[in-house]
Every structure is written in C-alpha cells, then in structure tokens.
C-alpha cells in the first residue's frame, strides 16, 4: 500500500482479501476506495491474533493484538460509508501439526516469521509435552462490503 497507485485504473469492483494488516488502515482504505467505482469487498480477520494465547504463554511472549474487523467498520463509517457485514466460517484446513518442527513452523508463520531459538525450543517442548491440542477447528473472517453509492 506504500507504492504509487497513479497507474492503477479505477474499477467497478475492487477486492481486498486478507491484505489489510497495515500500519495505517484509513490510508489503505482511502487508496482502495479511490480506485473503486461501485463496490469494495474486503475480508478481514475476526479477533486480534492468529496465534492462540496458550501458545504465546508457552513461549513467554506477549503479542500486541492488532485491531480486528470492528476497527475497519468504524473507519469506513467515519469516512461516510455504510459498510455491510457478513461472516465466513472457514475450516482451519492446515490441520493440527504432526511434529514439533511443523508446530514451530506454523507458529512462526502466525507471528509473522519471527521466533528466537529459545522460543523455538520452548515451542518444541510444549508440543512434545502433549499439552498442545488444537483449540479451534474454524477460522472466522469478516466479509465487509461497501456500496460507493450508499453514503450518508
């Protein structure tokens, strides 16, 4: 979203799926809406983190929860739009980890690629302790859409 969008054409419909974990959500939404003629469709996570609190506790890490879809709705409303909302319930298709190595890899992905060697060791120990059980079978996503003609 930091790139120059001057060459990006405006379109009737714009989709932004799972890409709005940005520092300045209002600016990103402004860019998307500037290229939207009719409708903007967005998927955004429900909840503040991709990693379970118990796993974070096992590695001794506090993660600053990022705003979830409610923040997105509030910004759109402040911008004068009346966003619509629905939910998508999607199975966690990756399934539970079958090895400590896979568990570490999945946790690393959920934390944006950053794990120290000490955290990796604690994760492996946690996995091998047998205490590690998948908490949720589904991931919930907010499906938000804006009709650009529906402003107040």
Language-model region placement:
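A short SAM/SAH-binding and catalytic strip from SAM-dependent methyltransferases
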Residues: 2-5, 9-27, 44-46
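Hydrophobic anchor at the start of a short beta-strand
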Residues: 40, 82-84
């Amino acid at each position: 979203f930091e790139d120059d969008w001057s060459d990006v054409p405006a379109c009737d419909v714009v989709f932004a799926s799972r890409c709005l974990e940005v520092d300045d959500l209002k600016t990103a939404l402004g860019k998307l809406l500037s290229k939207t003629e009719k409708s903007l469709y967005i998927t955004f996570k429900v909840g503040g983190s991709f990693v379970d609190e118990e796993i974070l506790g096992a590695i001794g890490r506090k993660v600053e929860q990022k705003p979830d879809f409610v923040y997105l709705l509030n910004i759109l409303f402040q911008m004068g739009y009346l966003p619509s909302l629905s939910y998508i319930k999607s199975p966690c298709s990756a399934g539970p980890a079958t090895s400590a190595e896979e568990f570490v890899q999945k946790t690393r992905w959920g934390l944006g690629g950053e794990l120290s060697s000490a955290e990796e060791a604690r994760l492996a120990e946690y996995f091998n302790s047998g205490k590690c059980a998948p908490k949720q079978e589904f991931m919930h996503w907010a499906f938000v859409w804006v009709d650009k003609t529906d402003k107040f």
